[in-house]
A protein has these predicted regions:
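Short cysteine/histidine-rich zinc-coordinating motifs and their immediately flanking basic loops
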Residues: 54-58
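Extracytoplasmic electron-transfer domains, predominantly the class I c-type cytochrome c fold
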Residues: 49, 59-104
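Sequence/structural segment immediately N-terminal to covalent heme-attachment motifs in c-type
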Residues: 26-51, 68, 72-76
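Post-cleavage N-terminal segment of exported redox proteins
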Residues: 1-29, 88, 100-104
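Intrinsically disordered, low-complexity segments enriched in polar/charged residues with Gly/Pro
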Residues: 14-17, 22-23, 44-45, 59, ...
Length: 104
């Protein structure tokens, strides 16, 4: 029974959930603050309106990607030339809120 419980936790993500992601997802982000962060850090590649330049268009990105995948992309820079960013959970939650506001 213990082994089955461990397997269940593992498959549901109980053992492999990143604490940063968990904390970020537990915070209510502010889209206005996220917009300011975006303008400081992201417009060079994603454009002033997030329409895409060197980096992809981010409109509807939150419809296509989970918040967890977006967080990992930002903090790890998974697809070159995207750099990794050191960001605190509140700022990441704000950036996510801004990205959700870009949905058409």
């Amino acid at each position: 029974a213990t082994f089955a419980f461990i397997i269940l936790l593992w498959t549901l993500g109980g053992f492999n959930q990143d604490p940063f992601i968990s904390e970020t997802l537990s915070i209510q982000g502010e889209a206005l603050s996220g917009s300011k962060l975006f303008k400081i850090n992201c417009v060079g590649c994603h454009g002033i309106s997030a329409q895409g330049l060197l980096g992809p268009d981010l409109h509807d990105a939150t419809k296509e990607l989970s918040d967890k995948k977006i967080i990992n992309q930002v903090i790890k820079g998974l697809t070159p030339p995207m750099p990794s960013f050191e960001i605190d959970p509140q700022s990441m939650a704000d950036l996510l809120a801004y990205m959700h506001s870009l949905n058409k």
